[in-house]
Amino acid sequence: MLRTDLPEIVTETLPGPKAQALIDRRAAATPSAIGCAYPLVIDRGEGAMIEDVDGNKFLDWVGVLNIGYTQPEVVEAVKEQADKYFHCMFNIGTHEGYVKLAEKLCSIAPVKGEKKKAFFANSGAEADENAVKIAKAFTGRENIIVFSGAFHGRTLLTMSMTAKKAYAVGMGPFPYGIFRAKFPYYYRNPEGMPQEDACSYYVSSIYDV
């Protein structure tokens, strides 16, 4: 049973022959801008384990599926939903699943105030874009403070907010009004700065911005 198996490499090389053939097809059909961190082609998964098309078994450390692959309760829920309908844009028609999930999120979100509302985005960058729009609409302020070292996404606005400039080469001009403060991380204090001075140092960087 894959769920309880240990990692195992059965091919002489990685990727194996079947995986290499699919990776070559990927390279021919999709842009290289969509990088790939590891030379495997997944065939199936159970729990935290995945098996590739050549039979190699890996422990998935990414953690996006934090309940694991093919979790039976989730599989049954997907099957049940697919039997009813599988797509309905929420700005065209209302469906209960969206409402139930929003209600659940609002019931547990640690946000002050009696009124809470939630909506769902397709990606982190889209969520960040909407968070900025909501903040600007509510405050009437034009500027944004972001931290050094931060990654926010690869849309035009979130690239501007992201500290790593490799993502933004050749993509300008960018929106104005984005200012960067030092992220409070004791391990990266300026050389020779004692820890007891670091808190005021990082707080003052926000005031300076």
For each feature predicted by the language model, list its residue ranges.
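PLP-dependent aspartate aminotransferase-fold enzymes
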Residues: 103-209
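Hydrophobic alpha-helical segments, especially N-terminal targeting/anchoring helices
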Residues: 51-52
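Glycine-rich loop-to-alpha-helix module at the N-terminal edge of alpha/beta enzyme cores
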Residues: 3-11, 16, 58-141, 145
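Short clusters of hydrophobic/aromatic residues that line enzyme substrate/ligand-binding pockets
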Residues: 9, 42, 67, 159-161, ...
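Active-site-adjacent loop/helix segments that line or gate small-molecule/cofactor pockets in enzymes
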Residues: 1-46, 63, 202
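Electropositive phosphate-/nucleotide-binding environments in soluble metabolic enzymes
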Residues: 16-20, 24, 44, 68-72, ...
